[in-house]
């Protein structure tokens, strides 16, 4: 089949090359310029970059749906997914250039990936059941939450935590010291060879790429893994920082403050709720304003300053509105009568009178309930907002649902959708509001002021992020959320992978071992799978298997080489590939490849002194999340193979290759969804 006809694969490869500089700890930032608004932002996020690419084509939409689905599920790993889409698109094109049938490419590549996933599970690092979070030493680390009292005397927002300024863009390549983190106990090796010889063959290939692909995990039970002992949250956070060390320090401080509030000295998946971690961005302010605080920190119009001063320190009655406070806000099931036309003598005045009437009723409801503070998920009518300000009632708009839920749990307020639902159960008590100040001055950003809202037993932490360069604000917020979710996934799963290319290197070695196998059982396995097919199909599967697996491995070759170059260890990809070949030889000569990789990457330096990055005399292992990494591989390969099949059907105007693989007499079970 002519490779030039596979336009879809070529488009994937073209779009994926834009994220090469985003791999590794030393990322090269990209400016994104909006030709309509003439504004620009600075980003190192493949997810943000995708939002600004031309995705009008069918291939672009498929790529967008795949990455959007992955980002929605994990909030991390999108760069790996994006990069591997390009790497495996190139690998598939090479297979087509060799004249390999599409059906064999799909079958062997999926088998190879599943085999690798089963094999690398042995390289997992198991966290202890409870990771000590050092919360007992919070005050010595700079966190001071004693300013919050039950009476609502919160003090200045800038005093809760010692300032942890984020570096400027020019200093983003500076990393802090990396002490040795984990002590391990080697366990017996569990190899992945002959992984699927006792299993039925299942080939899943879905075009519904926006669905969660976790059910594709067709691997054996997880083997025993290395255990982390005597480890603190500090070491785990540094291993997952991936070059975002200052931002990860902020995440670590937020988690410690959270543990202190719930009075826990240890951290596990039940005590760290990622939905109770919020951010507040202050573009244009110095990095000294960056801090972590207890409660909900947000921005409100400067007109509310007098109201907040009046309410400061007083226990407030709070209302939570899970909707909008506007006259036009209607129930989702409300429809205007069909074929009915409303005619008024003075249409403009009538509309104005209707809005005035609604504002009067809404204002009366609020006054009757004696409400001081209203948190609204949506927008608020400006006229109602002004009336409430005159009555010293504070209204905060655009409040996320998880924040409403947090205040509902601690104040007893039940969220309402409309003001007509207000009753004695829907109003909460004991909420407090204060102005955030620095050096006795109110913090003001773009005609808005910073406030903090707290309550007794409120399970909510806010990270206030600031930068003098407004264009970097989105990037800093993305980095914070990425680090937070990495730590969240690690604690939820209780396992991490060694990073820095460790599992990719093990996958390459495993695939090379599969290629080199020539035992009778290997060929018997092939013949058993294709016994119902023609001898040509059987011979082709055996003949092309090595080439297909080799192309699959080249995707990980590309990943590791770009990663090593971006880490500053090598000046060119050729030098990085030479290093990879040497490492593969060392692995092959070792009696236990997994033990070799574990030993090497548990003490491997992440940075290079020649790049001007300060490192300590000790090293810290780099870690990757387990499920986000594996799902990124799965989604990437499934997207590439979907495009491959679609291209093949367009070129040949036939789907005969599917009919062969879906034969009812076949011993293997192939599912094309």
From Swiss-Prot:
<comment type="subunit">
    <text>Component of the chaperonin-containing T-complex (TRiC), a heterooligomeric complex of about 850 to 900 kDa that forms two stacked rings, 12 to 16 nm in diameter.</text>
</comment>
<dbReference type="InterPro" id="IPR027410">
    <property type="entry name" value="TCP-1-like_intermed_sf"/>
</dbReference>
<comment type="similarity">
    <text>Belongs to the TCP-1 chaperonin family. BBS12 subfamily.</text>
</comment>
<dbReference type="GO" id="GO:0045494">
    <property type="term" value="P:photoreceptor cell maintenance"/>
</dbReference>
<dbReference type="InterPro" id="IPR027409">
    <property type="entry name" value="GroEL-like_apical_dom_sf"/>
</dbReference>
<comment type="function">
    <text>Component of the chaperonin-containing T-complex (TRiC), a molecular chaperone complex that assists the folding of proteins upon ATP hydrolysis.</text>
</comment>
<dbReference type="Pfam" id="PF00118">
    <property type="entry name" value="Cpn60_TCP1"/>
</dbReference>
<dbReference type="InterPro" id="IPR042984">
    <property type="entry name" value="BBS12"/>
</dbReference>
<dbReference type="GO" id="GO:0051131">
    <property type="term" value="P:chaperone-mediated protein complex assembly"/>
</dbReference>
<dbReference type="InterPro" id="IPR027413">
    <property type="entry name" value="GROEL-like_equatorial_sf"/>
</dbReference>
<protein>
    <recommendedName>
        <fullName>Chaperonin-containing T-complex member BBS12</fullName>
    </recommendedName>
</protein>
<keyword id="KW-0966">Cell projection</keyword>
<dbReference type="GO" id="GO:0005929">
    <property type="term" value="C:cilium"/>
</dbReference>
<dbReference type="GO" id="GO:0005524">
    <property type="term" value="F:ATP binding"/>
</dbReference>
<keyword id="KW-0969">Cilium</keyword>
<dbReference type="InterPro" id="IPR002423">
    <property type="entry name" value="Cpn60/GroEL/TCP-1"/>
</dbReference>
């Amino acid at each position: 089949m002519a490779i030039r006809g596979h336009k879809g694969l070529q488009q994937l490869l073209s779009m994926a090359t834009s994220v090469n500089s985003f791999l590794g700890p030393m990322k090269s930032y990209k400016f994104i310029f909006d030709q309509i608004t003439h504004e620009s932002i600075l980003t190192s996020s493949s997810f943000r970059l995708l939002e600004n690419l031309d995705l009008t084509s069918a291939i672009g939409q498929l790529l967008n749906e795949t990455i959007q689905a992955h980002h929605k599920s994990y909030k991390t790993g999108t760069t790996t997914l994006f990069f591997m889409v390009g790497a495996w698109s190139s690998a598939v094109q090479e297979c087509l250039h060799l004249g390999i049938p599409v059906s064999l490419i799909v079958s062997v590549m999926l088998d190879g990936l599943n085999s690798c996933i089963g094999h690398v599970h042995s390289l997992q690092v198991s966290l202890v059941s409870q990771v000590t979070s050092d919360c007992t030493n919070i005050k010595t680390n700079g966190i001071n939450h004693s300013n919050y009292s039950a009476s609502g005397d919160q003090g200045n927002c800038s005093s809760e935590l010692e300032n942890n300024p984020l570096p400027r863009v020019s200093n983003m390549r500076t990393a802090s010291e990396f002490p040795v983190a984990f002590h391990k106990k080697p366990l017996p090796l569990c190899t992945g060879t002959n992984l699927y010889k006792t299993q039925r063959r299942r080939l899943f290939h879905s075009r519904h790429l926006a669905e969660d692909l976790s059910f594709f995990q067709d691997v054996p039970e997880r083997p025993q893994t290395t255990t982390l002992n005597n480890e603190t949250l500090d070491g785990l956070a540094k291993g997952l920082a991936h070059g975002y060390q200052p931002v990860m320090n902020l995440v670590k401080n937020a988690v410690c403050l959270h543990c202190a509030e719930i009075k826990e000295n240890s951290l596990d998946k039940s005590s760290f709720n990622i939905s109770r971690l919020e951010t507040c961005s202050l573009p244009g302010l110095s990095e000294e304003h960056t801090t972590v605080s207890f409660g909900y920190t947000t921005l409100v119009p400067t007109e509310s300053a007098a109201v907040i001063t009046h309410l400061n320190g007083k226990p407030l009655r709070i209302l939570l509105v899970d909707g909008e406070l506007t006259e036009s806000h209607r129930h989702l099931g409300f429809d205007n009568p069909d074929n009915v036309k409303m005619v008024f003598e003075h249409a403009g005045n009538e509309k104005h009178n209707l809005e005035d009437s609604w504002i009067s009723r809404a204002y009366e409801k609020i006054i009757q309930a004696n409400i001081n503070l209203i948190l609204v998920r949506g927008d608020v009518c400006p006229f109602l907002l002004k009336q409430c300000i005159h009555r010293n009632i504070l209204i905060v708009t655009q409040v996320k649902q998880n924040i409403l839920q947090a205040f509902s749990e601690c104040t007893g307020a039940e969220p309402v959708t409309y003001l007509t639902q207000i009753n004695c159960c829907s109003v909460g008590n004991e909420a407090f509001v204060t102005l955030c100040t620095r050096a006795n001055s109110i913090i003001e950003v773009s005609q808005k002021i910073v406030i903090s809202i707290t309550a007794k037993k409120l399970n909510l932490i806010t990270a206030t992020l600031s930068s003098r360069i407004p264009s970097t604000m989105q990037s800093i917020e993305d980095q914070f959320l990425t680090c937070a979710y990495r730590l969240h996934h690690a604690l939820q799963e209780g396992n991490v992978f060694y990073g820095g290319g460790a599992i990719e290197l093990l996958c390459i070695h495993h695939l090379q071992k599969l290629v080199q196998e020539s035992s009778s059982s290997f060929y018997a396995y092939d013949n058993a799978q294709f016994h119902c097919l023609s001898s040509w199909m059987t011979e082709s599967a055996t003949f092309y298997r090595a080439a297909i697996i080799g192309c699959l491995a080249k995707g990980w070759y590309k990943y590791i080489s770009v990663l090593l170059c971006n880490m500053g260890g090598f000046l060119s990809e050729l030098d990085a590939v030479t290093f990879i070949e040497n490492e593969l030889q060392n692995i092959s000569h070792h009696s236990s490849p997994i033990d070799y990789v574990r030993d090497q990457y548990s003490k491997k330096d992440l940075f290079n002194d020649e790049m001007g990055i300060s490192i300590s005399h000790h090293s810290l292992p780099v870690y990757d999340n387990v499920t986000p990494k594996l799902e990124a591989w799965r989604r990437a390969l499934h997207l590439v193979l979907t495009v491959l099949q679609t291209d093949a059907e367009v070129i040949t105007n036939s789907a005969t290759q599917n009919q062969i693989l879906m034969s009812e007499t076949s011993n293997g079970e192939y599912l094309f969804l």
